[in-house]
Amino acid sequence: MNKCIAFHSYKGGTGKSTLACNSAILLARKGYRVCLLDLDIYAPSFHLYFSKEPRKWINDFLTSSANIQDVMIDVTDSFNSQQRHTDSIKSNDHVGEKEVEISGKLWVGLSNPQKKEIFKLETADTNTKRQAIRRFIHLRELLMSDFKADYIIVDTSPGIRFWSINSLAIADILLLTLKMSDLDIDGTRIVAEEIYRCFIELGSKAYLVYNMVEGYCVPRQTISNKEEISNISGSTIAQKPRNDIASVTQLLSQQRSDDDDWPSSLSTDLGIEIISFIPCYCDIQFLRKEFLTVLKYKDHPFTFQIEKLIDAL
Ligand SMILES: Nc1ncnc2c1ncn2[C@@H]1O[C@H](COP(=O)(O)OP(=O)(O)OP(=O)(O)O)[C@@H](O)[C@H]1O
Ligand SMILES: [Mg+2]
């Protein structure tokens, strides 16, 4: 059965684009036909990730009669030939190694990053906006019918803005991505109550994805020594030496002891299940192409987390 999955969050910088891209690539690597859409209309990024210029942008599709075939770019072969090239440099014996090649298909649809194009959509009159919403629905239908997409993966703009909400309207599954900060949590409560609930009532499924949680850069510790924790009571992370990972870990443990299981409490309050806890892997932030982690580093724990996430969907 085909599915349309959207990554959204209240606050920016929660990892939506990274997770969307890696999920799409991993699904394509597994042999599925995948369409990845940059519907972060206000601040697109996939044109930078994929370094491609489409014949037509998603903006053209939404506001005019641009053809879907001119919007979607087939990037499967460019990944596979890049991969073969890297393999051949690494070892002549392994030329053509197929391990991390994409065996399915991957297309991307890009949003136009030019200010005037973003502005044009933002300030469009009601009729144009109404037509664009119809085209949004049509976009999904075309990808399912003409491209025979098994999965449509959608990256969205954060927050409660016109195009973020409309991007969610085409999704069957909403992945509400958040970090473990009060701002993210309070924000998620707001969008859940004001927006997601309405989509859930209309039949979409929603899940919480906690991203960049402790457990890798900062090891996760269970509270084994209460006395040790009481010694650091009253301190803040900012007062601690920056490289003192052990004390940050203790502070996190203490924080947990104060409010034992708030990720689950949020989930219970909202009636939205948690689908994933993805640790913060600071090493992937140093990669120049973090959106390709699952392709380049198939044994990285981040790749396993993305596998788990897509298996759970
Ligand atoms: N699990 C993770 N571990 C470490 N770094 C991560 C993880 N997930 C995402 N990041 C990093 O966090 C940063 C923000 O990610 P990303 O751009 O995907 O967020 P976003 O939600 O799309 O942001 P925006 O709302 O601005 O579009 C990037 O540098 C990315 O590499
Ligand atoms: Mg993004």
Tell where the protein language model's regions lie, with residue ranges.
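P-loop/Walker-type NTP enzyme "switch/lid" segment
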Residues: 41-144, 285-292
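Conserved catalytic-core segment of NTP-binding enzymes
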Residues: 29, 134-275
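Short amphipathic alpha-helical segment that frequently serves as the phosphate-/nucleotide-binding helix
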Residues: 17-22, 185, 189, 303
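Walker A/P-loop phosphate-binding motif and the immediately C-terminal alpha-helix
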Residues: 2-42
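Hydrophobic/aromatic beta-strand patches that form the interior of the parallel beta-sheet core
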Residues: 5, 37, 107-109, 173-175, ...
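Conserved GTP-binding G-domain of TRAFAC-class P-loop NTPases and closely related GTPase folds
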Residues: 259-260, 275, 280-312
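Short, ordered loop/turn segments at secondary-structure junctions
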Residues: 39-42, 113, 158, 179-180, ...
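Short, hinge-like loop/turn segments at secondary-structure boundaries
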Residues: 52-56, 194-195, 224-227, 293-295
